[in-house]
Amino acid sequence: MPKASEIKKGFAIESNGKTLLVKDIEVTTPGGRGGAKIYKMRCTDLTTGARVDERYKSDDVVETVEMNKRAVVYSYADGDEHIFMDNEDYSQYTFKHNEVEDDMLFINEDTQGIHIILVDGSAVGLELPSSVELVIEETDPSIKGASASARTKPARFASGLVVQVPEYIATGDRVVINTAERKYMSRA
C-alpha cells in the first residue's frame, strides 16, 4: 500500500469504510525542524457524492482501491449531462455537470488524452491530460512591443476558464494550458 506522499489526484482510496476519489491535494509543512508534511486530500465519496476532507502525514499508509483507466473522447452535452465515448469499444459514459464541472473547463470536442476512471466497473471521474490546447475567445487587444515585458492579462476561453496570458497574445490565438496549475504554457 502506498504512503500518503505517493497518492495523486484521481486516485481512489479507502478511508473509514468509505471509497473516496481524490479530487485535490494540498501539501503543508508545519513550522519547526523535521516536521512531517501534511497532505490534505479533498475527496468525493463515491457512494453518496458528498465532499470529504482527509488529512494524512507524509509517511501514513493509505489504502487504495483498484481502478481502471480507459481512453475516451468528449461526445456531447445533453441538458445537465456530459457524454463521453470509449475510444476502443465505443461505449458511452454519462456524468452529471456538477460531477465534472471543473474538468469541463479544459474540455471541448477536440480535446485528446482524456481518460475515464472506473472503480468496480462504474465511471467515477475523469483524468485530464497534463496540458490542453484551447482557443482564446476574449482578451484585451495586444500591445505593440509588449513582448519584451513580462506583464500578463486575463484571457477567457469558450468553456468559461480564465487564465493569465502574456500581453502579446490576442483573441483567436490557440494556446497550451497546464491543466493541473491552470496556467498558460505557450502558443500552440
Swiss-Prot record:
Pfam families (alphabetical): EFP, EFP_N, Elong-fact-P_C
One example GO MF annotation: translation elongation factor activity
GO cellular component assignments: cytoplasm
SUPFAM superfamilies from the UniProt entry: Nucleic acid-binding proteins (SSF50249), Translation proteins SH3-like domain (SSF50104)
InterPro entries reported for this sequence: Elong-fact-P_C (IPR015365), NA-bd_OB-fold (IPR012340), Rib_uL2_dom2 (IPR014722), Transl_elong_fac_P/YeiP (IPR020599), Transl_elong_KOW-like (IPR013185), Transl_elong_p-like_YeiP (IPR011897), Transl_elong_P/YeiP_cen (IPR001059), Transl_elong_P/YeiP_CS (IPR013852)
GO terms, biological process: peptide biosynthetic process
PANTHER family: ELONGATION FACTOR P, TRANSLATION ELONGATION FACTOR KOW-LIKE DOMAIN-CONTAINING PROTEIN
Family: Belongs to the elongation factor P family.
NCBIfam families documented for this protein: PRK00529.1, PRK04542.1, yeiP
Protein name: Elongation factor P-like protein
Organism of origin: Vibrio parahaemolyticus serotype O3:K6 (strain RIMD 2210633)
